[in-house]
């Protein structure tokens, strides 16, 4: 009797705690740990598991998926994947013209610069666009000089204006033939990046919507009811026996 009761209680508790579903897969250990810590700071039940190729995946309660995505999106996660030189210039690639090689090289450099800028605290999105120089246009006149545009979307509570000279210097030193005064930087603050959701969180237990704070009490109450069932049945049995 006691074994059956304990087993029933354990099964109920495991059922009530719910099952977790994949939130994001194929993310790096570093980024995954940052995302996991962020979700737990917001009060969500989140875990990580190993994934393919040394990556990891994040899991959350099915009822928390929408909120988890919203929290991570406002914090700039998951970060964008950028192309590397190896991606742009594969070993088995076909021979390209000098202009094509230069374009691919500058694209790879722009990707690397974007990756570097995205590592700055508070940067949500970083883009670098490079315009190649034109030696001569169709009318024989001198072509347009090379230029670059940098777009950064950042947290609203961080002042990025002071970083503009360093950002321009980084781009200037990374791309050959690009003049400092031909680099423009556009900063766009994200008004809600650092806002945290303080609304009460609800969870579903046996199709009953309860607040996260009441979840433990409801599980305890239902477990107690299961424990009382065999006791009441036994008491009823003895009462019927005495009547006979």
From Swiss-Prot:
The keyword Transcription regulation does not apply. Residues 1-18 form the signal peptide. A lipid is attached at residue 19 (N-palmitoyl cysteine). It comes from Yersinia enterocolitica. The lineage of its organism: Bacteria, Pseudomonadati, Pseudomonadota, Gammaproteobacteria, Enterobacterales. Required for the export process of the Yop proteins. Induction: At 37 degrees Celsius in the absence of calcium. It is a lipid-anchor. A lipid is attached at residue 19 (S-diacylglycerol cysteine). It is found in: Cell outer membrane. Keywords: Cell outer membrane, Lipoprotein, Membrane, Palmitate, Plasmid, Protein transport, Signal, Transmembrane, Transmembrane helix, Transport, Virulence. The gene is yscJ. This is Yop proteins translocation lipoprotein J. The chain crosses the membrane at residues 218-238.
């Amino acid at each position: 009797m006691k074994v059956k009761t304990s087993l029933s209680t354990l099964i109920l508790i495991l059922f009530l705690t719910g099952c977790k579903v994949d939130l994001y897969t194929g993310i790096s250990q570093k980024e995954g740990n940052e995302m996991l810590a962020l979700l737990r700071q917001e009060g969500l039940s989140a875990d990580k598991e190993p994934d393919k190729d040394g990556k990891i995946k994040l899991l959350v309660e099915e009822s928390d998926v929408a909120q988890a995505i919203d929290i991570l999106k406002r914090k700039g996660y998951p970060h964008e994947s950028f192309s590397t030189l190896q991606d742009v210039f594969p070993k088995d690639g076909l021979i390209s013209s000098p202009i094509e090689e230069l374009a691919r090289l500058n694209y790879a450099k722009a990707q690397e610069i974007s990756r570097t800028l995205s590592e700055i605290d508070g940067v949500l999105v970083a883009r670098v666009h490079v315009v190649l120089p034109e030696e001569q246009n169709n009318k024989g006149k001198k072509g347009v000089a090379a230029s670059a545009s940098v777009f950064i979307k950042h947290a609203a509570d961080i002042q990025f204006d002071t970083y503009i000279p360093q950002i321009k210097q980084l781009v200037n030193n990374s791309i050959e033939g690009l003049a400092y005064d031909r680099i423009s930087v556009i900063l766009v603050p994200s008004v809600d990046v650092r806002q945290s959701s303080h609304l009460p969180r609800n969870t579903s237990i046996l199709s009953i919507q309860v607040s996260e704070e009441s979840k433990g009490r409801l599980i305890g109450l239902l477990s107690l009811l299961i424990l009382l069932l065999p006791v009441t049945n036994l008491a009823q049995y003895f009462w019927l026996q005495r009547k006979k």
